């Protein structure tokens, strides 16, 4: 009986469950400690080398960023020139169309026949 005067069922003792995944046939070895005192000089050299590499990469990144900005400014300048030339071509095309209309009007008034084989008039 338990302390509360109730009968408790008697269950058979169960073996503890162990998964075969938990089993490690190799005993635990000493954990590698990268901060051991005899490793400090090597770590400091490695840290110094990584810091130098980081500084070099930072300078290279700054250089590439500046080059990218320069190229983008050049692209914007060329795009502006292309836009100006496109507007000029459009103006000249409209002017040429007006001149052609005037020329056709004059040709019609003067009855000048157009013969394409002779290069114009």
From Swiss-Prot:
Disruption phenotype: Non-essential, it can be disrupted.
Superkingdom, taxonomy of origin: Bacteria
Note: Present in an increased level in yabG mutant spores.
Protein name, UniProt field: Protein YxeE
Organism, scientific name: Bacillus subtilis (strain 168)
Lineage: Bacteria, Bacillati, Bacillota, Bacilli, Bacillales
Designated gene of the protein: yxeE
């Amino acid at each position: 009986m338990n302390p509360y005067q109730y009968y408790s069922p008697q269950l058979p003792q169960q073996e503890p469950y162990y998964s075969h995944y938990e089993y490690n046939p190799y005993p635990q070895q000493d954990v590698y400690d990268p901060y051991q005192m005899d490793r400090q000089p090597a770590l400091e050299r490695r840290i110094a080398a990584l810091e130098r590499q980081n500084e070099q990469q930072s300078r290279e990144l700054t250089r590439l960023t500046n080059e990218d900005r320069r190229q983008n400014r050049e692209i914007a300048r060329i795009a502006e020139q292309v836009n100006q030339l496109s507007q000029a071509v459009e103006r000249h095309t409209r002017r040429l169309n007006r001149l052609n209309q005037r020329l056709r009007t004059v040709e019609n008034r003067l009855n000048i026949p157009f013969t394409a084989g002779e290069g114009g008039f």
